[in-house]
Amino acid sequence: MQTNLWIALDGGTTNTRATLLRGDRVIDVVAESVGVRDSVMHQRSPVLHAVGQCLKVLKERHAIVVDQVGVIASGMLGSDAGLVNVPHVMAPATAGQVAGAAFEWFDETVWPKPIKIFPGVRTGPDPSQCGLMEQALAEDIMRGEETQVWGLWQMLSKDRPQLVGQPWILVWPGSHTKMISVGADGTIFGSYTTLAGELFAAMKTATLLRRSVQDSNEMQYSDEIVDLAAKVVWEQGLLRAAFWTRVADVTGKLDQSQRSAWLSSAVIAADVDALSKHEWLNQKTDALLMIGGDKVRQSLYVRMLKKRSHCRIEALDANYCEHAAALGAVHLAMISNREGC
């Protein structure tokens, strides 16, 4: 479909978002607090409804003519918990390879035209050539972060070409933390994932620690709390540091917002410990490491990674982070159109 008007759908663990773009200019964004985690518990109906609702809102708000807009999707919408399972492309993967592996999905109750869904990227050795140990150490999967990479690559190529004119590593904290190795030409060489965000959410809502943090979203960070939490994790482990949240409550050492900050810092410290042990960081001492995500978490990752690696660290501006996935998906769609995929 030859068009300059796009709706880019992106589904994650906890949210579904639709971005309306004209070319590379973002016009509007709508979101639903529904993700594939809801589908795991309630089949696919929550995600189907969320996607349909996002599309309906944009269509009505902007009087969109269906035949004049291309609808594309990425992220977990292309998984077995999303709209349809689109097989991963193996790394190393170029944007052209991912664009060429797109799948057209149709459900008239969601949108009256087919939606093009892009696959994710899988990292790892050939299972037939290695044992389970090698697979566990090296195998990984991602859906959605590849579009963030190519969206960032597009934006930074225009604004700060010196950053992406060399190999770089992206760390993107979220429900899951992704570390991605990227070539100077945008080729994705692999990914490495942890469960940090979801683990923090589970700890503060589904364990005894809930009594100590009260599911608080107000966190009073300080250099002392962040550094001490990291020290305990790096010397004694996350499980000990996490339980001290309860100790700090019972003994009155920290108030509720400080306890929440302690627990958050401890999980991030464990995450940074895992990232820093990966060969991309412990062998490439001069690697360029770009950190995305929201500003607060980003600052904590930058602080801790400076202590655990010798990489050159660049904190990405929020303007680059906010719409990277949508711009990357449009980049894939334009490649797909150009090559007749």
Question: Which ranges hold each PLM region?
Answer:
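Short glycine-rich, Thr/Ser-proximal phosphate-binding strand/loop in the N-terminal lobe
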Residues: 6-46
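A short acidic Gly-Thr/Ser loop motif
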Residues: 9-15, 76, 171-176, 196, ...
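Glycine-rich phosphate-binding loops at beta-strand->alpha-helix junctions
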Residues: 15, 284-304
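Glycine-rich phosphate-binding loop plus the immediately following alpha-helix
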Residues: 37-43, 123-170, 176-231, 235
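Glycine-rich phosphate-binding/hydrolytic loop that grips phosphoryl groups
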Residues: 316-341
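Phosphate/pyrophosphate-binding loops at sites that engage ATP/ADP/AMP, CoA/4′-phosphopantetheine
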Residues: 53-70, 159-160, 272-284
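Short beta-strand-loop/turn "lid" adjacent to the catalytic site in phosphate-handling enzymes
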Residues: 61-139, 184
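Adenine-nucleotide phosphate-binding core of ATP-dependent small-molecule kinases
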Residues: 231-274
